[in-house]
Amino acid sequence: MAARLRRKVILGLGAVAVVPVLAAASPGAAGAAAAAGTSCSTAGTWQRGELNVYWLDVEQGDAQLVVGPTGKTLLVDLGETAWNSTGANTNATRIAQRIRSICGVSGAVHLDYVMASHHHLDHIGYAANPNDTSTVGNGLYRLLAPTGENFSVGTLLDRDGGTWTDANRDGDCDVGTSADPSNEIAWHNAGTTSQTARRWICWLYGPAAQPDRANIAGRVVRLTNSSPWPSLDLGAGVTATIVQANAKNVMEADGVTLVSGDHTTEAVPPSENDYSIGLKITYGKFEYATAGDTDGEYATSSFGYTYNDVEASLLGPFGNVETLRANHHGSTHSSNSTYVKTLAPESAFISCGSNSYGHPGNRVLDALRQVVNERGAGADIYLANNPCDLAQADGTTPTNYVGTLNANGDVHLRTTQTGLGYVIDYDTGSRTYTAYDEGSGGSGDPSQVRINEYLMAPNASGPNEWVELYNPTTQTVTVGGLYIDDVAGGGGAPKQIPAGTTIGPGGHWVFEFPSGFLNNTGTESVRYLAISGGETVYDSHSYSLGSTQYDKVFHRIGSGGAWCNTISTNVTKGAANPASCP
């Protein structure tokens, strides 16, 4: 039978919705043609009764295996470094054997869930197609195809990139070539496209009777923007919630155009990375965040596509976490300072291998080293390989690997005491951590949080206005559900801070919203307040401008100091302000 749905209420992207809980289907339940792999058993190396996260070394790519406390499994991605690798030379073959060892299974393994974060080779591999004249097929395709490793799957989760249309009515899904791609894909949420994506979509959504679809037919769940996304059943006590896909509700740099939708014919479309799936997993007090190659800035690549700040949409749903998998292999286009400071992890993993992209970026490494978290300052940084790239993207500046952990191979995280703590095992040892109560909110006083900086007239800096809050206390403070407003009794409607948002001790958090809320000229106020019947104003600042001052801010001295009365070009969004006024 198909995957079973239960229902519960969760909070995602700032709105309450009733969403399905996607229960794992049993092996072979979708039909006799499907392989009946064996589920994880107690004979494996995974830690029973705890949450296990395996970051699997696939060099410059991604693969994660999550094993729940009762043995339920989720594989997120299985990337390859070459489109034409086959057989024993693939990551798929090697990772299949690794999964067998973890699960204690000698043959084909049944995976409860498989998730493709987005449609790039280094995350999903390269699918074969019935029209191929030579042997190809690796990554997730080889893992699940009957002619490959023949693993079975309960539910295969895919972002809504597009579907097959059979434009030429020949009954199969044609991909064409890179030089002359077919027109058989109806793109839904896409910018840059590739043969990797076309082949993936043809495999997932092609003819039901196509032989290589036997193990996935009837098991694919496409995450559309029109329906609530499911949470996953990884066993009692585990919450696994999809919080982003397809760049839902994210605007491009103009502040008007949605990143979602079909942008494939545009001259400079969004990057495929922007459409990555974001997933949060919680067990006890332990919280983990992973989001594919999600971007965290507005910029245009020299390769003809745009980066968009999708990370801003994850701040509220993710909140403060114990462990973060850095987005996009530690790229400087991702894991921006606000994102790292808001999530405030105690540990982080970067999946990278030999590359020429400057991964990981020194800015990301420094942000993780300096982040203020529940145990003080600094997150432990684990790498799949060390070194990955020897230099930064400029080809000259050395990558600073000082203090990073794990030189080569898989890294295993396992919770302890049903989520009260966790241990990370790496190539030369292990480290033990305490899990904190971020998921239930901070214990600090929200009235002590201060407005620290704000920008009212964006232009070249991006599409959004923003207000930065600063937590001067030594405790995590929950600000979710509170408001940012302008003038009392007038102006625009108050902006509610997404539920679950917390600010760590000494931390900064930036609330972004589309331009048009704060006045560019005249007299205006910025207020941070609670609204419950009446208003309780915790902090406010007023200004008066005779003309629009684009890309300038009002800020305090340092963090939480006196206000500067002169507008400033020293924009320090998400970080400490200058030590003096302009």
Feature annotation, model-predicted:
Residues 69-74, 79-157, 313-331, 344-349:
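Active-site metal-binding motif and surrounding structural segment of the metallo-beta-lactamase
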Residues 84-86, 121-129, 133-136, 164-169, ...:
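Extracytoplasmic/secreted cell-surface and envelope-processing proteins
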Residues 36-52, 58, 98, 107-108, ...:
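Flexible, acidic/histidine-containing loops and adjacent segments that form or flank the divalent-metal
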